[in-house]
């Protein structure tokens, strides 16, 4: 560690033991959360604004306005419809369209049919993930999903193992449940962590009773507990443990970590063998530059315009409510009296 603390001079400072690796990943995750803190705070505020809530401004108390023309919601809804409506179709083509390459032509047709059938059989799942990723990109500014490999291995009569069933489902990852190491581009990211929540029974089945007793459990909330913004009734009913699945590209390992435990829960060597190592594609990031691989929502790029529209709407509404018809009239003129009364509404 450096003298200032909170920084890493060399990875060799941490012993290659579960306890030593826990200290290392605790430092990495702490630094990553600090880097993402402002984005998470702004993202939560933008989500609230999309749902009709208020977004705080530094220059004045804009949250006191009660009249709102939520063009941001209308804009995002329109963009979602324009950018995605149906599942994409699969097309597999040969790199070289040689006229006598029957093997390549047939292989391309087979692959296209296999992939098309996979999408059709899991169409609802893919559709849900794609819509969620797009919404996260357009509102807070970060869309992410990952692939999980499931494999069921059985033994035959001779005791030989064989793969009975295997699948690679696509999983949506909430924009607050992913973090990564400091970098300027996705290509340079040293590691990516995915957060999940496990019930005590699930922890027992995965790591045993002793580990389950030592973990901290709390109710899952819709927003990050570290943020000041809270939503009424956003707590889940279950007590769950916060588990981070960290894909370390530097060491080609996958580590399971939870804060407060004395060591990492588990470490595995790369079991997927993907060319890019990570089980996810590059994130859908809004307004990211090469200065730092960090998103910033589209709303903050145009928030002055949205706020100005709301201010004008507030002034119009206040003036409209203040305008009324006054005067004197003959008590016998019922029509005139009704006009004055209706003019007050």
Please state what every model-predicted region is.
Residues 234-345:
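Extended, charged amphipathic alpha-helical segments
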Residues 1-266, 341:
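Extended, helix-rich architectural segments
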